[in-house]
Each structure stands twice: as structure tokens, then as C-alpha cells.
Amino acid sequence: MASIARLPDIVANKISAGEVVQRPASVVKELIENSIDAGASRITVIIKDAGRQLVQIIDNGCGMESDDVLLSVERFATSKISEVDDLDALRTLGFRGEALASISSVSHFELKTRKAGNSLGTLLRSDGGVIETPQPAQCEPGTSIAVRNLFFNVPARRKFLKSNATEFKHIHETVKAFVLSYPEIEWRMMNDDEELFHFRTSDVRERLSHFYGEGFGESLIEVTEENDYMTIGGYLGKPGMMVRQKYDQYFFINRRLIQNRMLVQAVQQAYGELLEERQSPFALLFLGLDPSLVDVNVHPAKLEVRFEDEKSIRSMVYPVVKRAVRTADFSSEASFAAPSAPTVSGEVDLPEVSSRKLSYSSFSGKASTTGDLYRNYRAGAFSAPSSVSPMLFDSSLETSLSAGSRPTPMVQESLLTPSVDQPDTGDGENPVAPEKEPKIWQLHNKYIICQIKTGLMIIDQHVAHERVLYERAIDIMNEAAPNSQQLLFPQKIDLKPWQYEVFEEISDELYRLGFNIRPFGGMSVMIEGVPPDVRDGAEATILQDMIAEYQENAAKLKLEKRDNLAKSYSCRNAIMTGQKLSVEEMRMLIDRLFATRMPYVCPHGRPVIIRLSLGELDRMFGRT
């Protein structure tokens, strides 16, 4: 065995580069962090050939003295910390002193820098870690670093780079995170000589709309919270604005982008049933806390952190997010693209880069209350101009669209039971007189269309009733006040072994809900009573369907028992698509929907309500 010897710096730097510089996006991240730490107010990012040919970052930061230039490309040389205690009070993004040494060892590297008060700057070049003597140079105040031919001397690393589209996607996501977290900085990005964006203002919503589509920024929920321990601020997406979890959830600790599973789970759980399966909400959250309470020196990439008290962080983030999303107006607003929409400057048409911009209609980012939309609905009775021909509102038309005026036998009687109060509109107004009720129709025995003050409201009748039944089931089980209707002829059901096992698991909760079921030998049970919402003759089918859905939810979603049972119960008992409703039934369903705590989404996260504004209709008909 050979004797132990210290590795030459050039070899050590290449080894270090394996962790610090994983791909071109890593270079972009490290150089931008240096620019921000230098106090830059303007940063330009220039990319060529997805970073293979060129990554260049230009800033107007403080720059460096000529004596510091050589030190900047040495390992473990930094201006950001000087002693071990500094690691507990980090106020900068960089601190390890590895980045420039690692980057310059695997590229053709050029650095130009000048302090604002100096007449000349300094130029330094490095060819794969072989550093040339720095030279005086004319340059702008600040620093410009150009990294060419990345991994030219490490063929294995260059070989394993992905396609240009994939590598540029990573670069773009990296830059986007900085652009969103540092709105006070002017950002410009060039890709293969094309300008992708140039943000001169500090409007975060404007930047979000650029990246995610027109109106996206205005449709977010703003979050702010502060106490003695930490601050929380940022933006959250509505359930209809689902995203890819990996790239469209941003968490910053003291403005440092981090990856943290606990924070992802806290946000996901705070949304709860507002999300459909395998969906994740958009999140841009900034957490501020004492640097001594978080360790960022976990990995050279500086994306992972360790909290001193992770449970306390979660116990603050979870309720803040939950409170924000539960008080927001989640009704979707329909949006239709204009026939000749202009191309947005800076879109990148790459196969693996998401360049298609979604359209989100502009509506207030501040949360509207349930009462706001309900008042809008009730006010719809007075919106029609008095000069409109009566023929347009002939009663025969309303009758045909609403599919009759009599309750159909298939609809649960409980829907019409006046036991639930109308939602409080919050203004003490008297109810609308029956002859002045808002116009309402049923479309294809599937959707309920209502005239509201600002346009139209469309409700999915099945998921609306699901929401009503779900909250009623939760309340009944929590209050331990079951309401059971005894069957004149009890029904015996033979269950499969797995069904009987599930039945035994949930039998106590079934009783709380209003099911009176007792074992009847072997794998059989006898249904003697059911809740009022269960349709006559469907008792056995409903029970078996509930057991099947409960089992599926338990396996996939890991739901709490009571929540799972309420979801299964509401889904199987709600009025179905294709079921005719009378005008009276539709009005009662709407009133009960708006009496729930969250009328905008069903228990599984699907939207219940869509609004179509008069302004949108005017645009569709070319009136604006």
C-alpha cells in the first residue's frame, strides 16, 4: 500500500466539485448567492447551451479588491465567517468558501471585479484549476463571473448530464426561486441570446404571473403571521391551482431556499380534504427565525437544514396555513382564452420545460367570506333589467330547464327538511321574498345554474350534496348524537371476510353516525336502522359501498377513521348525476351548501362552485 500523502489542491478541488457542482444549475445557484451576499441590486444571468457552453452571472455588488481575487478561488477562503461561533449566526447565503474553487477546477473560468471607488478592476482566469496571474482590467463596478465548458476535464460528469431541456429546466427553476425570494433585486435572464425576462419592479405577484400565467399572482392567498419565535409570510394557492409538488412549493428560511419534508407535509395536511388525491398546493412561504435555531451546515449544496425544534416549527406553520386556506373563497372563476392572445415575451419552448402558461381570471387575492358569495347569489334576484322582455323569463322555460316542480322520489327527504338554517349573510337583511328568488335552473340533471349579481354561478349538484352530508356526518359523530330511522323490515347482509373485518373496525363510528347494525352470526350482519339520508331500499348497497370506499381510502390516503367514514358516507349517499331536482330542492341544496364551513370544494378536493362573470361573458361576445 502506498504511503499516505496530502492530495494536491487541484485534485481536492475536483473531488469537492462532485458535491458542490452537480450540474450547471449548481453553478448558477452558487454564483447568484455570492452576488446577493455582495449586496447586488441588479443581477443578470446569461446561459448558453443549457449551461454547457456558458454560465455567466453579472452583478453590481460591492466587488473585490485585487488582493482578494486570488483568495476567492482558494478552498475554504471566505469573507463571510471567521470563527466557529459564526456558524450559529449566519446572515449570508454562502459561508463554506468552496464554490469558486470547485467551479474553477472543472471549467474555463473568468472573473472580473471592481470596487466602486477604484478606477481599475481585476481580471482572473483559470483553466481547469490552473490559475493565471490576475491582471488589471477595465470593467463595471461589481463582479462578472463567466463559467465556460463546464466539466470539460471531467468527461464522466459531462457524459451524465441530461438533455438540454432538462438541464435548462433546472437552471430556470433555480433562478425563479431567487427571483421570487428577492423582489428588491432587478433580475434579467438571457438564454441563447434571447431575453426571457427583465424584472425592474419589486412586485412579487407580477413575477408570479409571468412564471405561472396571467392573473396567477392576483389569485393567491396572502399569508402573514408573526410572534416572538418566528415570522411566516408568503402566498398559497387555491385548490384549483394544483402544481407539481417538487418544483412549485418554495420554502425559505431567512430567505434561504431549503428542502424540508416536514414543511411539505405540514402544508399538505393543512389543506386536508381541500385537495384531490396526489395533488399539492402552490406554496411560497418565507420563515424567519433566529439563525442559532437552524443548522444550514448539513450538506455542501446548502439545501438541507436541521431545526433545533422541528415540532415547534410545524406547530406554527400548520395552523397558520390551515387558517388562511379555510377562510378563503375557493370558488373557481371560469376563464376562456382570447382567440388571438399575444405571445408573452420570454416564453421558452423546450420539450421538458413547462412553457404553456395557464390562464387564471383576475379576482381579489384577499379571502372573501362564504357570506359574500351567498349575498351575491341572493342579490341575483334583483339584477335583471326591468326592461327585458317577459318572454325571456317565461315560466315554461324555467320549468323545462329545472326538470319539473315536484320533488322526485329518488331525492332524499332530508334535503328538503327545514332543520338547517340558511347561512348568515352577515348584514341582517331579510330573506328574499319567494317571488323575487334568484333565477335557477338544472342543466342536464347534473349542474345547477344560478343568476348572481355579478354573472352566473354553476354548482355541481353531486359534490355540493357531498359537502353538506360530509359536514353533517362529522358533526353528528363528534357530538355523539345519532339520528337513526328504524327499518320496518331489517335487512340481513352476508359480508366477505375483509368486509367484516372493516365493519368491526368502524362499527362504533357507524353507530355514532346513525347506523343500527348488529352481528348476526358468521360473517353476516343485520341492518335495523340507518341515518335519514340513506335512500329507501339502498341500505345494503350503501353499507357495502361505504366499507369498500373506507378500505380504499385507508390504504391510499391514510385518513383518520372518522374523517374517512364521513367521506365514504357522503360520497355514497349524495344525490347523483342524472337525478332530477325541483326548483325547491335546488334552492334548499344551495342554502345548505352555503351553511357549511367550506362550500367551495367537496370532501375529496374537487371544486363545487364555478363563477362566470359578466365581464368574461362580455369579452367572449366581443363587447369589450
Curated annotation (Swiss-Prot):
The record, for InterPro entries, names: DNA_mismatch_repair_CS, DNA_mismatch_repair_MutL, DNA_mismatch_S5_2-like, HATPase_C_sf, MutL/Mlh/PMS, MutL/Mlh/Pms-like, MutL_C, MutL_C_dimsub
What does the record list as coiled-coil region(s)?
A: none
Mind naming one GO cellular-component term on file for this protein?
mismatch repair complex
Q: Which UniProt keywords apply?
A: DNA damage, DNA repair
Highest rank taxon of the organism: Bacteria
Q: Which family does it belong to?
A: Belongs to the DNA mismatch repair MutL/HexB family.
**Purpose:** This protein is involved in the repair of mismatches in DNA. It is required for dam-dependent methyl-directed DNA mismatch repair. May act as a 'molecular matchmaker', a protein that promotes the formation of a stable complex between two or more DNA-binding proteins in an ATP-dependent manner without itself being part of a final effector complex.
- Record HAMAP family: DNA_mis_repair
Q: Name one GO molecular function term.
A: ATP hydrolysis activity
Is Cell division one of the keywords UniProt gives this record? no
Region annotation (Disordered) ranges? 416-436
Gene name of this polypeptide: mutL
Q: Which NCBIfam families match?
A: mutl
Q: Which CDD domains match?
A: HATPase_MutL-MLH-PMS-like, MutL_Trans
GO BP terms in the entry: mismatch repair
Q: Cite the Pfam families for this sequence.
A: DNA_mis_repair (PF01119), HATPase_c_3 (PF13589), MutL_C (PF08676)
This chain belongs to the protein called DNA mismatch repair protein MutL
